[in-house]
Amino acid sequence: MTVTEATGWYLRGDVGYAFTDLRGARYFQGSNATEVDFDDADLDDAWTIGGGVGYQINSYLRTDLTFDYLTQADFRGSTVGQCGFPLVDCTSSDRSSLTAYTLLANAYVDLGTYGYVTPYVGAGIGGSYVKWKNLRNVACADDGSFCDDQVTHGGKGNWRFTYALMAGASVDVTCNIKADVGYRYLHIDGGNMFGYADNGGPGRDKGLSVHEARVGARYLFGGCAQASYEPPPEIPLQQPVYK
């Protein structure tokens, strides 16, 4: 078997572990004229799984369209204010979670092949649909004397602009299968997070920064070809010449 010229369509599949960083969150406190930051806003890590279709243009340039799913990442936050009657200082504990679907158009530069290994860099642009579940918050007096009833704010979902930066290396497994190990950074814009309830909200997040460690594989159609049979050259037979 021989490897044909590195061009043609391919399919890809990837899984990854996502170190997610919420760049903060804001909400309207008591009035739509007063927007304040969450005092704490933390998002747990999650997993990603995805796939795509692409085209290897030549030995150095390829492009693909990918669709990925970010599994549930739990949110924990807190805010400070006043609650009860008469009003006393309170701290609110907030809980929610999100998932995200990301669609990207990507381009990569393969930096040459060294043995079986081809390092690359790349970038992508597209959008992410971020879906927040309901946000539940309970406000408790700082002196521990009481807690208000839980308030539930309806979660929001929307599409956000997203870009990606990638680096990694592929390893030739067979003539048409490449293993892929890499890093991807996703920048997801901010958007709506939860709605109004009980004199609080709506709220929005400031966006996500996602650092992914990824492994996957690419299957290149037509990457293998049978070496064609070439018969040995014929040796011309020359009749003897008699003088």
Task: Please give the residue ranges for each predicted region.
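Extracellular/periplasmic catalytic domains that process cell-envelope and extracellular macromolecules
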Residues: 3-7, 56, 114-115
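Extracellular/periplasm-exposed beta-strand and loop segments of Gram-negative cell-envelope proteins
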Residues: 20-45, 68-102, 127-160, 188-212
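Outer-membrane beta-barrel "beta-signal"
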Residues: 10, 207-243
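Repeated loop/turn-to-beta-strand initiation elements of outer-membrane beta-barrel proteins
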Residues: 60-63, 115-117, 171-179, 223-228
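Short glycine/proline- and aromatic-enriched beta-strand/turn motifs that initiate or cap beta-hairpins
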Residues: 1-50, 216-222
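K/E-rich alpha-helical interaction surfaces of small helical-bundle regulatory domains
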Residues: 11-14, 66, 166-193, 203-212
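Residue-level detector of the transmembrane beta-barrel scaffold of outer-membrane proteins
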Residues: 10-12, 62-64, 118-122, 178-180, ...
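Residues on the lipid-exposed face of transmembrane beta-strands in outer-membrane beta-barrel proteins
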Residues: 13-17, 51-55, 105-109, 123-127, ...
